[in-house]
């Protein structure tokens, strides 16, 4: 059957922009190397022209140098053409990469949009408002509880301005009664030190000279103390 209808040929995939750009860059680099070699030859011919005298020999050197120069110009034209192709391919590659980035961005945005829609289904603004209202109510109840717990007991609520003025007048009268001769209340006067010795009425400490009765002198020893009487010896 293959002989009659023929076998299907395997088609190769078309080259990508990057493959084509790499191949052209290699060709351009090869041409650039050839141009550098021709520059070296031209430098040699220039040195030979300086050393040779005008005549047939110098003309032969000029002819060879002219041939090398023509080859260089041809290679430079090919190099410029290849670099232009590379530039065009780079522009196309940049545009293609930009489109790929745009596609990926669109895909990411669609996925994010779908995810946000799913999240918005579980979060409703009405539920949030209701939650806020409930929290405000709870805070009000908490404030009332704290205020109730902080109340003071046994404080009369029927006090008015007359009661206040009466209390102040009574305090002023009490303070006037406590005011002493110098016009200063007793509670503002400095404290006086108490003479504890006079209150206790303690006698003065006896001295060595006043201990003996008047009219009779008492003998003292070398230390100022009363001398011990010596017993008399009987014969």
Swiss-Prot record:
Coiled coil: 99-148
Membrane topology designation: Peripheral membrane protein
One Pfam match: Snf7
Location of region: Disordered: 1-29, 175-235
GO BP terms: protein transport; vacuolar transport
Keywords associated with the record: Coiled coil, Endosome, Membrane, Protein transport, Transport
Gene Ontology CC entries for this record: multivesicular body; multivesicular body membrane
InterPro entries in the cross-refs: Snf7_fam
Chief location of this protein within or outside the cell: membrane
Ranges of biased composition (kind: Basic and acidic residues): 20-29
Family: Belongs to the SNF7 family.
Oligomeric and partner information: Interacts with SKD1/VPS4 and LIP5. Interacts with VPS2.2.
Record-given protein name: Vacuolar protein sorting-associated protein 60.1
Gene that specifies this protein: VPS60-1
